[in-house]
Design a protein with these regions (language model features):
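N-terminal Rossmann-like NAD(P) cofactor-binding subdomain of oxidoreductases
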Residues: 1-124
């Protein structure tokens, strides 16, 4: 069986590093890209020493052109950021959001609790 190529956006926070640990142990997953904004060029092990034992790509800035190389895109980003990515997905992509952006199905309730207008209404 071919390994499933994944991209993790927001890989350096607590949720992101825990996800990296879990996926490193999965025999059918290949972490193709680790993405961040302020951590570009660094190794993920700078954020969690337990990850030193794995061969992982360096952190890069997210680029929507990368989506063609992966099937699954995990997002662990600040509120409001994952919805921007959802509008750029290809038909073959599956997005698993670990933030709050798609937690609620009603945009008015989302705005009330998070103070941000939801821009990806088709994905709710």
């Amino acid at each position: 069986m071919n390994k499933l190529n994944v991209l993790i956006a927001g890989s350096t926070g607590y949720i992101g590093t825990q996800l990296v640990k879990l996926l490193c142990k999965h025999k059918n997953v290949k972490i193709k890209y680790l993405c961040g904004n302020t951590s570009v060029g660094k190794n993920i092990s700078a954020y969690d020493k337990d990850l030193k034992k794995y061969k992982l790509p360096k952190i890069i800035k997210i680029n929507y052109k990368l989506f063609k190389d992966v099937v699954v895109i995990f997002t662990s980003l600040p509120n409001g950021e994952s919805q921007k990515i959802s509008n750029k997905l290809l038909k073959k992509n599956i997005m698993i959001d670990l933030s709050a952006d798609f937690r609620l199905k009603n945009s008015k309730i989302y705005n009330k609790y998070y103070g941000i207008k939801h821009i990806s209404l088709n994905s709710l």
